[in-house]
Swiss-Prot record:
It is found in: Secreted. GO terms for biological process: axonogenesis; cholecystokinin signaling pathway; digestion; eating behavior; neuron migration. Residues 106-114 form a propeptide. Residues 1-20 form the signal peptide. SMART domains: GASTRIN (SM00029). The modification Sulfotyrosine is found at residues 96, 110, 112. Keywords: Amidation, Cleavage on pair of basic residues, Hormone, Secreted, Signal, Sulfation. One of its GO terms (molecular function) is peptide hormone receptor binding. This is Cholecystokinin. PROSITE patterns: GASTRIN (PS00259). Binds to CCK-A receptors in the pancreas and CCK-B receptors in the brain.
């Protein structure tokens, strides 16, 4: 019930919002004028981009590239760590003495009463 009421209120608000927007005038004398105006607006927006913000972005990219070159990639360092481990090495935070891994028990451990 509450969900339906909320949906109706939402639809009413959306409908009222679309009806409240002004209707653009239909200028039949010059049909391409609106397209030209939109193109001019886009050009003005592009021209507003400062050279300063471009320089700031360039500095950030340069700093990121320097850090990426200095730091070893995670994959290579992981491979080196794995190669240095002994194959019989136990993972100390995951393998516990006395714990049973239920996925590896064999059927021979059980005594079945038939």
């Amino acid at each position: 019930m509450n969900g339906g009421l909320c949906l109706c209120v939402l639809m009413a608000v959306l409908a009222a919002g679309t009806l409240a927007q002004p209707v653009p005038p239909a200028d039949s004398a010059v049909p391409g004028a609106q397209e030209e105006e939109a193109h001019r607006r886009q050009l003005r927006a592009v021209q507003k981009v400062d050279g300063e913000s471009r320089a700031h972005l360039g500095a950030l990219l340069a700093r990121y590239i320097q850090q990426a070159r200095k730091a070893p990639s995670g994959r290579v360092s992981m491979i080196k760590n794995l190669q240095s481990l002994d194959p019989s090495h136990r993972i100390s935070d995951r393998d516990y003495m006395g714990w049973m891994d239920f996925g590896r028990r064999s059927a021979e451990e059980y005594e079945y009463t038939s």
